[in-house]
């Protein structure tokens, strides 16, 4: 159990299973009575693809890597980017982190477009300047083979953009009204980037740009020479564009974040009636974007219930589906996470692409990153959901990897998925079974997450709240008697614990004292005997390790005072 502690309160950082070459913090437990592996070939999802490397392209920035996960167990093949580098020694491949996946099915190929996380392990923000794409086809879905085209486009392709903030985008194909003839097709890439003029004016710089290409691999060029939409026009941070063309030919662009989802129709050609991919509908003045605010069917909020960001809208039959990052605490029945710095994938439905939206439920539970950013599409005769996690080796909330899993449908049109974004189990045995325990705490600050103490990650720098547990309160400190408990379904035999404490410049500090207790067979908590000592050293380089007489128990408690 690793703790990140602070002035007048205690916070704990990621902990868990020690295995392979990665040190994952947690309660150090004796090797007896280990919990069974939770991921097996029978209960874990299996999705992958066959390498496709035949598209014509002429893009000098592109680097191509072949990914072959076919030798891995089936349940480890679906994290496309998470396992990249396992079978390919290329350093660029091993160190490549991808996020914000959006999928496109075109000409028998599956394209998963992503952003590129370049943040260092201790950097507490996004560093994103370009986009890439994973490509496969239907023939080898279970082989785990992909072709990764890196840097198919850069944010600085827009002369009006700063070259930074290459966040989540989407590529759509325009068949120019001739679906049987692909020779005249164009591709449009809707991406959020930072606008130079807005930034110079001290405004939120994010804007949506649209690029154009004859190939989904590029090269891409600015389609209109200016932002399609800016934050000053929309009055919300203008990110996460999602483009959708309805069966009647009307195009819609959805976007938004921080609980507000907006949409705008695209203009139609007066002669042909075809939707424009580069012009939005305006109000009667001819210049003001005609924005539509998405409403929840129950409470008339500024978005579907639980909505945070990353909308993805599509139609199936007569029903419109709105899939998004959601589940923030405070969103009522849509809450599916413990921390407001986490997300799950939820969805709502409507009989209109502009809502109102009726909440339906969760497709994919919360993962290891602060966002998940879904896309959903049909490829062949199956449906899939893409998303990202922070589970790749060396991953953080700003160094992510994309995944893909199957989506199933009930007879009444409800979406379900077997996806559960967790790390694949390590194959080597371990003396540490912290990750198999259920965690409880006497108090957890809202932005923090008690599950971080045994999620299998130890970060050298704690950059956002989900990476630690804290008992900070806005009342006079110190608090006495706060504790964290590991509870197992069966008995374990424990003889040591390793704890990390940390401080910050505000109100967090190490506890005045702490001790380890175990749950006795009679149901009472008892102190472990012969402890080697309870130090309160702070910092990741100085874990506090205590050994004690071995105990057989179903629960261990870290009890803190002061």
Roles of regions detected by a PLM:
Residues 412-468, 503-515, 559-562:
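Juxtadomain low-complexity/linker regions and immediately adjacent membrane-anchoring helices
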Residues 98-100, 166-168, 238-240, 308-311, ...:
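Conserved positions at the start
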Residues 243, 375-377:
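Catalytic nucleophile loop of clan PA
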Residues 464-530, 540-562:
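Aromatic, loop-rich ligand-recognition surfaces of beta-strand-rich domains
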Residues 535-537:
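Short beta-strand segments within Ig-like beta-sandwich modules, predominantly Fibronectin type-III
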Residues 42-168, 173-236, 245-303, 315-321, ...:
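Beta-rich carbohydrate-recognition and catalytic domains
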Residues 96-98, 105, 126, 306, ...:
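Short, surface-exposed loop/turn motifs at beta-strand boundaries within globular domains
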């Amino acid at each position: 159990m690793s703790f990140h502690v602070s002035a007048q309160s205690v916070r704990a950082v990621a902990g868990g299973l020690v295995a392979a070459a990665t040190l994952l913090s947690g309660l150090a437990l004796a090797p007896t009575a280990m919990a069974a592996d939770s991921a097996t070939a029978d209960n874990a999802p299996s999705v992958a693809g066959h390498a496709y490397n035949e598209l014509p392209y002429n893009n000098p920035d592109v680097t191509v890597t072949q990914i072959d996960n076919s030798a891995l167990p089936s349940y480890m093949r679906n994290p496309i980017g998470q396992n990249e580098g396992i079978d390919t020694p290329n350093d660029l491949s091993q160190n490549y982190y991808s996020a914000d996946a959006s999928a496109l099915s075109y000409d028998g190929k599956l394209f998963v477009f992503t952003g590129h996380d370049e943040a260092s392990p201790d950097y507490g923000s996004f560093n994103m300047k370009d986009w890439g794409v994973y490509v496969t086809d239907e023939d080898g879905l279970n082989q785990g083979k992909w072709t990764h085209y890196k840097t198919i486009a850069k944010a600085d392709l827009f002369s009006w953009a700063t070259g930074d903030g290459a966040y989540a985008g989407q590529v759509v194909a325009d068949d120019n009204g001739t679906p049987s003839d692909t020779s005249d097709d164009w591709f449009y890439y809707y991406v959020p980037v930072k606008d130079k003029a807005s930034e110079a004016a001290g405004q939120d710089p994010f804007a949506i740009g649209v690029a154009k290409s004859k190939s989904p691999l590029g090269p891409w060029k600015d389609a209109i020479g200016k932002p399609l939409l800016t934050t000053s026009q929309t009055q919300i941070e203008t990110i996460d564009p999602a483009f959708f063309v309805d069966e009647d030919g009307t195009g819609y662009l959805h976007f938004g974040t921080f609980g507000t989802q907006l949409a705008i129709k695209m203009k139609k050609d007066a002669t042909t009636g075809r939707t424009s991919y580069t012009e939005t509908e305006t109000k009667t003045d001819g210049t003001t974007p005609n924005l539509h605010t998405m409403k929840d069917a129950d409470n008339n909020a500024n978005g579907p219930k639980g909505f945070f960001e990353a909308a993805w809208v599509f139609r199936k039959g007569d029903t419109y589906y709105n899939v998004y990052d959601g589940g923030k605490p405070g969103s009522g029945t849509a809450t599916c996470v413990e921390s407001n710095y986490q997300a799950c994938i939820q969805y709502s439905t409507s009989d209109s692409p502009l809502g109102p939206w009726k909440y339906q439920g969760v497709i994919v539970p919360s993962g290891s990153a602060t966002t998940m950013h879904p896309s959903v599409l049909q490829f062949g005769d199956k449906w899939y959901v893409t998303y990202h996690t922070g589970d790749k080796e060396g991953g953080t909330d700003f160094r992510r990897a994309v995944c893909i899993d199957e989506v199933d449908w009930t007879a009444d049109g409800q979406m379900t998925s077997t996806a559960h974004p967790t790390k694949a189990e390590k194959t080597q045995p371990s003396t540490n079974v912290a990750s198999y325990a259920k965690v409880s705490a006497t108090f957890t600050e809202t932005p923090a997450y008690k599950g971080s103490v045994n999620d299998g990650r130890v970060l050298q720098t704690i950059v956002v709240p989900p990476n630690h547990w804290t008992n900070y309160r806005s009342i006079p400190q110190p608090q006495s008697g706060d504790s964290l408990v590991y509870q197992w379904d069966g008995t374990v035999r424990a003889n040591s614990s390793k704890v990390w404490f940390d401080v910050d410049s505000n109100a967090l500090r190490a506890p005045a004292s702490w001790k380890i207790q175990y749950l006795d067979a009679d149901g009472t908590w008892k102190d472990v005997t012969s402890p080697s000592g309870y130090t309160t050293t702070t910092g990741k380089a100085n874990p506090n390790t205590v050994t004690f007489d071995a105990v057989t128990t179903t629960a261990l408690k870290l009890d803190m005072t002061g």
